[in-house]
From Swiss-Prot:
Ranges in a coiled coil: none
Protein name: Ocellatin-L1
Biological source species: Leptodactylus laticeps (Santa Fe frog)
Sequence positions bearing Leucine amide: L25
Cysteine disulfide partners in this protein: none
Keywords for the protein's UniProt record, in alphabetical order: Amidation, Amphibian defense peptide, Antibiotic, Antimicrobial, Immunity, Innate immunity, Secreted
Length: 25
């Protein structure tokens, strides 16, 4: 459903941001 799609997008975004932060450290 829509909620599942939003949850998946949020996880992808969080993972992407975490990767960016780790690369800067």
């Amino acid at each position: 459903g829509v909620v599942d799609i939003l949850k998946g997008a949020a996880k992808d975004l969080a993972g992407h941001l975490a990767t960016k932060v780790m690369n800067k450290l």
